[in-house]
Amino acid sequence: MSTKPEITITYCTQCQWLLRAAWLAQELLSTFSDDLGKVSLQPGTGGVFRITCDDVQIWERKADGGFPEAKVLKQRVRDVIDPQRDLGHNDRATPEAN
């Protein structure tokens, strides 16, 4: 039996990013509830905000230029754990504002 993927969200406690990390964890658990083994929050310092899936980096605040939108994060996680999965409205293009 293979184990389910595990997500770790490392967030800066000095920057008070716990609520942002918890919200993204909830978004991932809502979307991938049956596909993930665990989503954990790991306190850090020094402005860190990193999301990994089984040690594969999904998002890193400095490298990716800020924080992820939930839609983009879900797409990146999906691309790692189940690339063929349709995310429904999260995979639809957003119309450009005029």
Predicted feature descriptions by range:
Residues 1-98:
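Domain-level signature for proteins that mediate thiol-based redox and metal-cofactor handling
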